[in-house]
Amino acid sequence: MSSCIQEIIQKLIAEYAPTKVILFGSHARGNPRPDSDIDLLIVKETSERFIDRWVMVRRILSDPQRMVGLETIVLTPQELSSRLAGGDQFLAEIVQNGKVLYAA
């Protein structure tokens, strides 16, 4: 795992306290290109609205010096379970093939 990803995960754990972080996409598959984004599914038990969670994570991880894009999906455990039960193939792919980088 790259030092950039490790740094992002450590900051996320320290400042947001997620229950799980899953890396997906080209970085998880081990074939990122120089212009590849870092894609993260972040799971946290919270009552905050979806957009508020996303904004908070973006603020925490904002770094104008980072030379790589960052894409995040922030869900509660209940939202994740519900979407998987509803047949969300995108999330199923992430859960099945992503790399769990952190689990509380």
Range-by-range predicted roles:
Residues 1-20, 29-34, 44-104:
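Catalytic core of pol beta-like nucleotidyltransferases
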Residues 24-26:
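Glycine-rich beta-strand-to-loop/alpha-helix junction loops that act as flexible
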Residues 39-43:
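Short beta-strand->loop micro-motif that forms the acidic, two-metal-ion catalytic signature
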